[in-house]
Curated annotation (Swiss-Prot):
Organismal lineage: Bacteria, Bacillati, Actinomycetota, Actinomycetes, Bifidobacteriales
Record protein name field: UDP-N-acetylmuramoylalanine--D-glutamate ligase
Positions with a binding annotation for ATP: G108, T109, N110, G111, K112, T113, S114
Enzyme nomenclature, EC number: 6.3.2.9
Keyword presence, Cell division: yes
Biochemical pathway: Cell wall biogenesis; peptidoglycan biosynthesis
Domain of life: Bacteria
Amino acid sequence: MQVADKTVVIAGLGVSGTSLAEVLRERGTHVIGVDERKPEADLHSFDDVDWDHVDYVMSSPVFNPRTPFVLEAQRRGIPVMSEVEFAWQLRVNNERTGTPAPWIGITGTNGKTSTTEMTSEMLTACGLDAPTAGNIASGDMSMSLSRCATNPQHDVLCVELSSFQLHFTDSLALDCAAITNIADDHLDWHGGRENYAADKSKVFHNAKRAIVYNAQDAKVSELAAEAQTAEGCRKVGFTLEAPQAGQIGIEDGWIVDRSGVAGGAVGESVRLAAITDFTHLAEPDGSLYPHLVADVLTALALVLGLGADRDTALKALTSFKPGGHRIETVAEAAVEGGSVRFVDDSKATNGHAARASLSSFPAKSVIWIAGGLAKGSRFEDLVKDQAHTIKAAVIIGKDQQPMIEAFASQAPDIPVTIIDPEDNDTVMDRAVEACGTYAAAGDIVLMAPACASMDQFKSYADRGNRFAAAAKTWSEVHGLH
């Protein structure tokens, strides 16, 4: 992609936008940064853009496809691209191989981050410079996707891809790609379920070595079957059940490959590791969280699809620990007859993730902190499906009505406490106090809200940290000593 002497409008100066602006300027591009909230922006309104002299637009994920400036650029025939698309087209040759580093792309409604981290850890153990990048990126601009793609030292990029990023991305041809699952999320942004799925499916287009898909998800399986991949690209389904030919799964307590990705023939059973090797991913009673097992299968199929050493990868995987705010016990209070456990799953920002979290616990054991920014989602199916697990619910957030209506229609016998949304600073303290009124020995106070956090918190991490602090305080005040 030739960007010297071109004019690029960067819409949104967050980490990805600011980083891309720097990369482009280093290549002689005239960059116009537009952000109404950033004093350092070149312009603070899209009304001030001289569209007659713009060659490309990079759109931040905060802007949906129906945003006026996006429509105006498209009307004029100006390409609107994501940072992912720019990074893909700007990538440089690896200094050792002389060709661009392979990209492994992971998307899905849930499981993206853990899978991306597992993939990176295994490849790093195999001696490769394989950073995580993309939607997973922290505030470190040196590890943004555009920086990683233009760094000749990286051997492989492990890229978490959101549906927002993929919408304005069209030329990807990943070496390996995975879709972990698809459930209703961000439907307001995409304008519907089919649009959302279509954007997710872009990771499979023209994939070169392997695509990995959830064989227990009908929509993902359909996308994999329809995917137009490069000749010789392997399609690997993962399942938590015994695998069929073409799949990797669980059989008699073992991870078993029958896809051929582990070196055997398609249909031949190859035992890879005992599930008991992954007790570090288990809850305190030793039972494994099913969604983390799914992440293990996905990541393993991806690295084997790339050709990584099997034994080295497995050794790294068996010592992997997921990041914070993912079904993490943050406090435990001794009470009469036992204890109450507080579990932070703030990363569960949609119904699909919350279902996976809730389903990990025994019947009528969960006091559930739910709610937040619903993003157009409904929760009737979730509440109906998990009513047997939920002992009580405490609803937070500014957008409480969808969750309130779900309990009223699907589980009217479950007690519900609604937290006044007015004071953001104390909302989590009040929520945990409310949970304490229901808690008894053996119960789990689970914060897996099924909603985004930005209505009352800085991020899902901020929400999780506040929950952990409130849980520890409650345990100190109310727990037996």
